[in-house]
Amino acid sequence: MSITRPTGSYARQMLDPGGWVEADEDTFYDRAQEYSQVLQRVTDVLDTCRQQKGHVFEGGLWSGGAANAANGALGANINQLMTLQDYLATVITWHRHIAGLIEQAKSDIGNNVDGAQREIDILENDPSLDADERHTAINSLVTATHGANVSLVAETAERVLESKNWKPPKNALEDLLQQKSPPPPDVPTLVVPSPGTPGTPGTPITPGTPITPIPGAPVTPITPTPGTPVTPVTPGKPVTPVTPVKPGTPGEPTPITPVTPPVAPATPATPATPVTPAPAPHPQPAPAPAPSPGPQPVTPATPGPSGPATPGTPGGEPAPHVKPAALAEQPGVPGQHAGGGTQSGPAHADESAASVTPAAASGVPGARAAAAAPSGTAVGAGARSSVGTAAASGAGSHAATGRAPVATSDKAAAPSTRAASARTAPPARPPSTDHIDKPDRSESADDGTPVSMIPVSAARAARDAATAAASARQRGRGDALRLARRIAAALNASDNNAGDYGFFWITAVTTDGSIVVANSYGLAYIPDGMELPNKVYLASADHAIPVDEIARCATYPVLAVQAWAAFHDMTLRAVIGTAEQLASSDPGVAKIVLEPDDIPESGKMTGRSRLEVVDPSAAAQLADTTDQRLLDLLPPAPVDVNPPGDERHMLWFELMKPMTSTATGREAAHLRAFRAYAAHSQEIALHQAHTATDAAVQRVAVADWLYWQYVTGLLDRALAAAS
């Protein structure tokens, strides 16, 4: 029985719009059960084929050339049946997974509504409040609960999208074959805390259906060899219908926790706290830890009694249509949609969630997209919409201002430095290219980045607070996504977006919690004065990725984060940006759209300077250099003592020009123009460093020179590889 929609005087306001999952979890459980029955029939046929193969060909009844050919053909059919078993296991576990997600979301939302309703009852009976105060308090509570429910629906939609490339758990096939019939779902009836809920365990009566084949089944196995009756002798197998009750025991945490939330009405201000039934998203039991989950789970005696009866048409019934099994993407083929077609996942997200929009399919040049994915994963899917997609979308709608981010020579704020040591700094050296800044999979970005270091708008802070308790049940995943959303909002703040044509940031988070960012300008470009938090990676400055791969993604930040994840063998969970920035791209994963009130007034973040991000060894060397030895890091001063003419405004305008084009190959023109700007900025920084009289100003100029030296060298290598 599916979880019903909460009722109450304020329930509708807490649920509409977009605060309730309209999908029916029982539909998915029923489909999983139907496919489980198909799996049992396929397994019966498979066991019969194996038995007959061993009896005829291995028992010596038939030998010779014709026998070998027939043996090979039958072996091929057996392999096909095993493959079909794997497909069915994928479909069954996916349907149960989606049903569990829907169940969990509904029960969490029910908890929120019930807790808020109890708090409202307290407020309505509070004699210390006047009518206006009571009305205001109730409205704020209803609004906060509605926001939490909408966020839960959005989070569920994201997790449904993540299941596009669903892979069944280990030993899933063995577990399914041991059940004989799928276990009834454990439905957490948190919404209506009535004592009638224990009646749900009565559903295991359905396992009685496997008992019906047992009387007729032993009759047919007697026909083969005397050893065959051993299979019918497993009348102990009827006990296996009891095993659906045992899978219920791993799921006991789900019904147990529903009882506690209604009893404990404490802290209803954060109605998401009772959300503890986390085991529900994975309803499939895993009691049998068999070691090998591959496509050879040979369980000869599983459905023995009913198997040998009719190997051709099991049960005499029309064979169910099992085409949906092929729709589940195979684990080894994640990138079949890279040619520009639409990618069909097993389900669609709830489009009522305002903050998550399903990834739209868009035309992508197949060759270019495939070239951007060095490891063969689905990196290019829709990442670059060829000619018609204005990749200068997002911030690209701003009018060209012709203003370059010019750094003045009287900067007073020095970058964060460690205490200078007394040693003599070595002479200037070329930028290091051997530094490999690989993502640390052992800890995600949220483990090392305090949220207080990221600016956040009041509206976003309120939403995060409302959903904090609900996300606590999956601590790492929720925190990483919440942190990534805040970073994306800060990068889109007005003080981080100077209105340069086509310049915008994209933020992505992986399934293991890593956060990577990319922008549409140059390579390793970070605007002056901007800092990135620790454990946040810049895709175009990754030393491990070949420079030609990085260059292919220039001006296309969505493609850049996809290529970064593919190179490091990671899976993207979501891509975050504004609606305009994500409109013409298909990242192949969930899109999280930033709302206008998500973006803070200031995007100033505390973390690493741009030199520390792109060249950590040079930043460390600069920090260890005393003020008296700063010039040792630079080449000799130019012979001409006159300052070079500052042409950065015009050069910046030139690098913006390619961003107005949607033609293929605009990235090469942009990189050439950006290289000219970087070289000129390096020349100006060198002159400023040699002529500065203040140590703080000189240190800033040296940092600028080291940064632009690195960027110039990177662009030189990229352009050389492209030519």
Swiss-Prot record:
Subcellular location: Cytoplasm
Domain of life: Bacteria
Main location: cytoplasm
Biased composition (Pro residues): 210-229, 250-265, 274-308
Compositional bias of kind Low complexity: 200-209, 230-249, 309-319, 393-404, 412-426
Basic and acidic residues composition-biased segments: 432-444
Residue segments, region Disordered: 175-360, 393-451
Role, per record: May act as a chaperone that facilitates EspB secretion through an interaction with EccCb1.
Organism field: Mycobacterium tuberculosis (strain CDC 1551 / Oshkosh)
GO cellular component, as recorded: cytoplasm
Protein name: ESX-1 secretion-associated protein EspK
Intrachain disulfide bonds: none
Name of the gene encoding the protein in the UniProt record: espK
InterPro entries for this protein: ESAT-6-like_sf
Keyword terms of this UniProt record: Cytoplasm
PANTHER family in the record: BONE MARROW PROTEOGLYCAN (PTHR10068), CELL WALL ADHESIN EAP1 (PTHR10068:SF14)
